[in-house]
Every structure is written in structure tokens, then in C-alpha cells.
């Protein structure tokens, strides 16, 4: 009788441990309504979804996959020193580089804090990387393992950023930056 009780207790403890393990794994996975990103091209597909219905209001854009192993391209595109924490990156920018607009989507590697990457990108990206123009507004956030950063003028950046938030459903902390315009001298 004593053996049966001990076996029953051991089995109950094993079942509880398994249930707790499953609950922990489910709660640890990133929460997002976005479709799983399995390859870099999936980021391009997401960008196209974000642009639906907004094409007439945006400049002519070109979406490219950025090689996460190319530190120079990563620095220019994201502001990050390297792509060590990134699995995939896609960038959408105008065909004419004198128009200040950039949308960056990045999938972070497993175990990397996407919100922290969004914050770092928002702090380090060059909002004046274009010829004679700069981004007036910058928005960045994350959803699950996807980072979104868009910078441009308010009229172009805000609707695209809002569409990402709508598609994602749940997002992490939001980071914004407004370009301070230089003060012009008074007319003589």
C-alpha cells in the first residue's frame, strides 16, 4: 500500500512538472498576430501588406533584403554596429535617394530582446543619411521577434507605422524621435 502511494505521488509530481514546463514554453514564445517569418522574403511580403492602400501617398519605393553578415550595410540600414543579433533584415526606401524615407523590418535571433534592438536602432540610426534631406519623424517598436522602424516626414511615416501596429496586434515599447530643425537667421 505504501509503495502505491509513493508511486502515485511521484507520477503526480512528474505530471505537474510537465504541465509547468509546457506553460512556461507557451508563455515564453513571443506574442504577435504577425505571420511567422521563416525567410527574409517573408519580411518583404509583410512590407507589401503594410503598404496596401497607401501606394499613392508614398514615394516610389524599392524593397531589398540586407545581408546580416555585411556590417557596413547593417550600420547604414539599421544603425546597429553589426547583424549578430539579427536573423533577417528588409529595407524599403525610395528609388531616388533625395527623398527621406526608410522602413526597416528585422527579425531578431532566438533569445534576443526585440524591444531592446528597436530602442538601439532608434537611438543609433542616421536620420540624415540622404542627400540634403533628413527624416522629420522616427517611429520604432517590436512585436514578438520582429522590429519595425520607419522614418520620414509625418505624412509618410505615421500611416505605415500605424499599419504595422494594426497588423501586429500586440507591440512592445514604442520609441519616437522628432528631428529638430536648425534655427534660421532672421532676414536682414
What are these regions (language model features)?
Residues 2-102, 108-188:
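Soluble, non-membrane globular domain cores that form compact, hydrophobic packing
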Amino acid at each position: 500500500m505504501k509503495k502505491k502511494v509513493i508511486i502515485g505521488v511521484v507520477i503526480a509530481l512528474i505530471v505537474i512538472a510537465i504541465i509547468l514546463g509546457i506553460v512556461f514554453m507557451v508563455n515564453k514564445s513571443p506574442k504577435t498576430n504577425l505571420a511567422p517569418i521563416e525567410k527574409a522574403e517573408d519580411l518583404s511580403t509583410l512590407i507589401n501588406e503594410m503598404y496596401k492602400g497607401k501606394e499613392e501617398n508614398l514615394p516610389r519605393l524599392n524593397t531589398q533584403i540586407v545581408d546580416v553578415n555585411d556590417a557596413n550595410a547593417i550600420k547604414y540600414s539599421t544603425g546597429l554596429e553589426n547583424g549578430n543579433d539579427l536573423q533577417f533584415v528588409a529595407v524599403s526606401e525610395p528609388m531616388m535617394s533625395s527623398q527621406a524615407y526608410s522602413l526597416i523590418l528585422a527579425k531578431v535571433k532566438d533569445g534576443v530582446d526585440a524591444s531592446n534592438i528597436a530602442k538601439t536602432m532608434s537611438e543609433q540610426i542616421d536620420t540624415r543619411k540622404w542627400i540634403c534631406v533628413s527624416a522629420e519623424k522616427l517611429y520604432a517598436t517590436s512585436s514578438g521577434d520582429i522590429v519595425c522602424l520607419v522614418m520620414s516626414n509625418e505624412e509618410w511615416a505615421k500611416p505605415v507605422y500605424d499599419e504595422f501596429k494594426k497588423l501586429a496586434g500586440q507591440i512592445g515599447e514604442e520609441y519616437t524621435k522628432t528631428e529638430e530643425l536648425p534655427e534660421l537667421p532672421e532676414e536682414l
